[in-house]
C-alpha cells in the first residue's frame, strides 16, 4: 500500500478534542454525500459530538439576523442541514452494551485509505464482566452509486457464547449542531428536517422527510 494514501492512529483517545478531530479526519464522502466519523455506538451523554450526514446542495431557508433593519441587508439565507442519521448501531452481548468508554480496550486502531475511500476501526475489547471480543467497523461512500453509504461490522467472540444483538437506528429528524460558546457556528439548536412517512419493507427502513421552508424532500 502506498503510504501517501494511508493514515492510521492507535490508542483509545477519550478526550473531547481527540473525538471531534477523529470525526473530521475519518469521515466518508464522495462529493454528493458526506458522513462525519462519529462512533457508531455513540458517546456518553457528557461528551459533545458533531454527528452528521450531509447531501451536497440539499438545503433549507433560515433567517439571517441583522443588528439593524437597513436597506440592502439580507434577511434570509440558505443553510446546509443534517439529514437523517443512519450510522448509529448499538451492540449488545447479553445484557452488556459495547462502548469504548467502559470495560477495557486492549487495542484500538483507526485508519483511512484515501485511494480506496475506506475507513476502518479495529478494536479488541473486554467488557466489565469479562466478555472478550474483536470488532471491525468498515465504512465507505460509493463513487459508483453516489447516494450509497455502506457500513460493515465484523464481530468475533473469543470467550463468550450467548446472545449477540446489533440494533441499527434510522433517525429521521436530526438537528443541526449548535454551540452558544463558539462564534463560528449557530448558537441555537435548529431542526430543519421533519419526518413525514416512516415505514419498513422487509429489512429496509424508509423515511420520507421534508425541509421546513425550501420545499425539498428526501427518502
PLM region spans:
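Beta-sandwich/jelly-roll carbohydrate-recognition scaffolds of carbohydrate-active enzymes
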Residues: 2-219
Amino acid at each position: 500500500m502506498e503510504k501517501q494514501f494511508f493514515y492510521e492512529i492507535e490508542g483509545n483517545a477519550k478526550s473531547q478534542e481527540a473525538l471531534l478531530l477523529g470525526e473530521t479526519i475519518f469521515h466518508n464522502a464522495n462529493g454528493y454525500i458526506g458522513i462525519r466519523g462519529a462512533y457508531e455506538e455513540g458517546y456518553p451523554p457528557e461528551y459533545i459530538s458533531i454527528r452528521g450526514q450531509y447531501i451536497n446542495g440539499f438545503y433549507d431557508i433560515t433567517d439571517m439576523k441583522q443588528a439593524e433593519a437597513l436597506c440592502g441587508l439580507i434577511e434570509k439565507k440558505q443553510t446546509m442541514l443534517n439529514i437523517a442519521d443512519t450510522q448509529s448501531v448499538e451492540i449488545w452481548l447479553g445484557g452488556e452494551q459495547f462502548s469504548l468508554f467502559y470495560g477495557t480496550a486492549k487495542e484500538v486502531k483507526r485508519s483511512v485509505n484515501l485511494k480506496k475511500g475506506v475507513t476502518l476501526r479495529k478494536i479488541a475489547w473486554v467488557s466489565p464482566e469479562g466478555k472478550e471480543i474483536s470488532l471491525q467497523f468498515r465504512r465507505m461512500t460509493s463513487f459508483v452509486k453516489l447516494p450509497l453509504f455502506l457500513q460493515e461490522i465484523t464481530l468475533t467472540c473469543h470467550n463468550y457464547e450467548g446472545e449477540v444483538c446489533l440494533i441499527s437506528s434510522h433517525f429521521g429528524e436530526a438537528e443541526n449542531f449548535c454551540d452558544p460558546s463558539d462564534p463560528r457556528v449557530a448558537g441555537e439548536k435548529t431542526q430543519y428536517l421533519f419526518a413525514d412517512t416512516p415505514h419498513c419493507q422487509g429489512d429496509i427502513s424508509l423515511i420520507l422527510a421534508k425541509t421546513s421552508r425550501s420545499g425539498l424532500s428526501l427518502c
